[in-house]
Amino acid sequence: GCIKTGSFCTLSKGCCTKNCGWNFHCNPPNQ
């Protein structure tokens, strides 16, 4: 699943395009 991240979340880190609540969430590239 996605993990909570700050604004440092980038596409290279596997960002989801959806905003789950207050923060964008990221999926680690290895998941």
UniProtKB/Swiss-Prot annotation:
The keyword Secreted applies. Disulfide bonds join 2-16, 9-20, 15-26. Keywords: Disulfide bond, Hydroxylation, Ion channel impairing toxin, Knottin, Neurotoxin, Secreted, Toxin, Voltage-gated sodium channel impairing toxin. GO terms for cellular component: extracellular region. The modification 4-hydroxyproline is found at residues 28-29. Transmembrane segments: none annotated. GO terms for molecular function: sodium channel regulator activity; toxin activity. The record marks 8 as: Hydrophobic/aromatic residue important for potent activity. Confined to the epidermis and to the mucus layer. It is found in: Secreted. Highly potent toxin against both insect and some mammalian sodium channels (Nav). It potently inhibits inactivation of insect sodium channels of B.germanica (BgNav1) (EC(50)=2.6 nM) and also delays the inactivation of mammalian Nav with potent activity on Nav1.1/SCN1A (hNav1.1/SCN1A; EC(50)=7.9 nM, rNav1.2/SCN2A; EC(50)=24.3 nM, rNav1.3/SCN3A; EC(50)=105.6 nM, rNav1.4/SCN4A; EC(50)=46.4 nM, hNav1.5/SCN5A; EC(50)=215.2 nM, mNav1.6/SCN8A; EC(50)=36.3 nM, hNav1.9/SCN9A; EC(50)=97.2 nM). 1 uM is enough to completely inhibits the inactivation, resulting in sustained non-inactivating currents. The presence of a 'disulfide through disulfide knot' structurally defines this protein as a knottin. Belongs to the nemertide family. Negative results: does not show effect on rat Nav1.8/SCN10A. This is Nemertide alpha-6.
